[in-house]
Amino acid sequence: NLTDWNNNLVFETNVIPYRKNRYRGNLLFARNAENGRGLFFLKEAPGSGVQLAYGGGDFTAEFGDFTVTGLGVTEKDLREGEWVKAYGCVLGVWSGGELEQLTALRSYQKNLRKLLPGRDEMVMMNTWGDRSQDTKVNERFCLAEVRKAAHLGITHFQIDDGWQVGKSPNSAVAKGSFKNIWDNPDYWKPDPEKYPRGLHPVVELGRELGVEICLWFNPSVQDGYADWEKDAQALVGLYDEYGIRTFKIDGLAIPDKRSESNLRRLFDRVLERTGGQVVFNLDATAGRRGGYHMFNEYGNIFLENRYTDWQNYYPYWTLRNLWMLSKYVPAEKLQIEFLNKWRNTEKYAGDPFAPANYSFEYLFATTMAGQPLAWMEASGLPEEALGIGALIERYKEVQHDFHRGVILPVGDEPSGRSWTGFQSVDGERGYLIFFREQNPDRKARIETWLPENSKVRLTPVLGSGKAAVQKTGRRGTLEVELPAPNDYTMYRYELIR
């Protein structure tokens, strides 16, 4: 996590346990090489660097003995007669190879929160990615954005910081604060100067055009979220009045167990009062937050802030982060951004991996294994960009079916010049996405999670692939052909017995 500062999100260590040693991380896999069986420990906690009461390690291993350490609780957190939730520990077992190992982990992760197509699947647009901050958001701007978003096939339009009466520290119009939010009882009401009729016109147009309106929200951080009940009521009030049920939760800081417990109370209360209809997009970009393995029952993860303005959006970087995480975190629980490639082209002058060197369709394709996030203003797109709507409409037809499977990385790690991709495994069927980055080879042999020496039918769904029947090679290898660099294809596959 802390993706504002980190761009390498997964680290793997492979050891033969010997004398007693400590290891850091959220996951430990242990395999018995004699019989091919194994177990895993999942520590349901933030990343090691931001855990509470951290003792310097998460696991100890000594020959065949393994221990999970670090409850995230000290004696100061205990209150007589009150239960205190420690960090969770999941123990799982498997038999077989790496696919069985990862499937065992994923079967638990997928059951933490049922992925409902009408609630959890989304192709979201959030205008903050164009760096206008809160200078543009008002009724007129949002109505225009919703119309264009509908043309693009967007399902959810999220109004970020600036819709509300209160001003945050990130405001470009009047520097505000997150401290003592409830000194202003109207802080979380629509700004009457920007939205004189409230959010009703925007919400109603969205319903008419099939675009769900979503909002940004920053819980009241002071005194360990002591005002969590007021925050919960504000969110429930927005749900009751406008039907808004998807909220980006930003600005979290969890310095102690009381803060963590009150945040859970906030999330639980909102889900209880809305019949489980609300989705929280939990921002993982900064601060002491939940990370990839905590609060997963509440929604999905807003993964990263990337901007062409600061030249830190590279399509292959975004693809790489999704590819690396997808082995251990459900890809369908990650919001993955694509940006307006026509902005700030001069800042990437001469850079072969500049966003402008890719088709807009390819940028969208890099997000398809996750929950796509159009991190941009629709009004800033040129006319040629609107053609992506046909691709997004076709993607939405298979989005949930793709996300139902166990999504795992295939091919080589994205580097800007690799053959790479994803596989969604669902029994004897599933999907494959292949990317030919700026690689000179028209064809590649790519290892997959398919069984060896098996006949498989490949049916193109999106992109540039051609229908084929192949027999897999060693490690499930398939031969893939794409006619040009920076191209992609999505196949539906089925094993032929």
PLM feature spans:
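Active-site-proximal substrate-binding groove within the catalytic cores of carbohydrate-active enzymes
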Residues: 82, 86, 267-469, 481-483, ...
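Short beta-strand-to-coil "C-cap" segments at the C-terminal boundary of structured domains/repeats
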Residues: 92-94, 492-497
